[in-house]
Regions:
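Alpha-helical structural signal in soluble globular domains
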Residues: 16, 72-80, 123, 127, ...
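Hydrophobic faces of well-ordered beta-strands that scaffold small-molecule active sites
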Residues: 22-24, 86-88, 133-135, 166-170, ...
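Pro/Thr/Ser/Gly-rich low-complexity, intrinsically disordered linker/stalk tracts
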Residues: 211-246
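Solvent-exposed loop/turn segments at secondary-structure junctions
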Residues: 28-30, 92-95, 138-142, 172-175, ...
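Alpha-helical scaffolding within the catalytic cores
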Residues: 108-125, 144-159, 180-185
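Polysaccharide-binding and catalytic clefts of secreted carbohydrate-active enzymes
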Residues: 1-129, 138
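C-terminal structured "cap/appendage" subdomains that terminate the fold
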Residues: 172-195
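Core-facing hydrophobic residues within beta-strands of well-ordered domains
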Residues: 19, 130, 194, 238-241
Length: 246
């Protein structure tokens, strides 16, 4: 019922308004709080155990609940306006290396999308259920638990596919406090799969926190540019632009 309601809301927004995209942030299952387990025993009994899941498979069941939501939202958009994009801005760590039997996780030590929020972002990218992915890499270069460079390298290598754009979510206040804007911008531009940045929160740019807006305008965004093309959403080139004046 919850998925159906959310999809009805998405369908209403997409059909009534000329929007570019439906965007979701990092809220799937709640962020865990010590001593406060998520109260879904009755739901798991009805929709999990009664459907063939084992007691030990509650995590898999939760992940599949979220997978179904993402898949159904994408399908809802495709049936309404297939050119409208669907994107996610997940928490910045997919899985820590120590949590993955094959060592495929990042060399980090923090909360995890897959294990703690039950958000299998890498699968959504692989399956083409989202059109863009903006992991929130809000830490500094050299952070002991979640190093910025380690994480953007991981996302650039492990969670990309043709047709799903990768952008880096930047924390403006923390970046400027650490005086790392230049290093971050130059490094992410060296990665082949990264299409750009999204800066959070926007008011830090408007307030020009520690000169961030000036630096972006003068050094990194000096010239107008088109956003990267989402060619997988359509197979026709737009018509030639006419009546332009130099």
């Amino acid at each position: 019922e919850s998925r159906q309601f959310i999809c009805r809301v998405v369908r209403d927004i997409v059909s009534r308004y000329d929007i570019d995209a439906i965007h979701m942030d990092d809220y799937f299952y709640p962020y865990p709080v010590a001593g406060m387990p998520f109260p879904d025993d009755k739901s798991f009994q009805k929709y999990g155990l009664n459907k063939g899941y084992k007691v030990s498979q509650r995590a898999e069941w939760r992940r599949e609940n979220v997978n179904k939501l993402i898949r159904e939202i994408k399908r809802t958009i495709l049936l309404s306006k297939p050119w409208v994009r669907f994107g996610i801005s997940p928490f910045g760590i997919y899985r820590n290396k120590k949590s993955t039997p094959d060592g495929s996780g990042s060399n980090t030590n923090g909360l995890q999308n897959y294990d703690d929020l039950y958000a299998d972002v890498a699968r959504w990218v692989k399956e083409g259920w989202i059109d863009y992915n903006i992991p929130q890499i809000y830490w500094e270069i050299g952070h002991p638990a979640a190093d910025y460079i380690t994480l953007i390298q991981w996302w650039n290598k492990n969670a990309t596919r043709e047709g799903t754009h990768l952008y880096i979510g930047q924390n403006v206040a923390r970046t400027m406090k650490a005086d790392q804007l230049t290093r971050k911008m130059l490094y992410e531009r060296s990665l082949s799969k990264v299409k750009g940045n999204c800066f959070w929160p926007a008011n830090e740019i408007l307030w020009n926190n520690k000169g961030v807006a000036d630096s972006l305008k003068q050094n990194y965004h000096r010239y107008p540019a088109l956003i990267p093309a989402y060619t997988h959403l359509h197979n026709r080139a737009p018509q030639e632009v006419k009546k332009l004046k130099a």
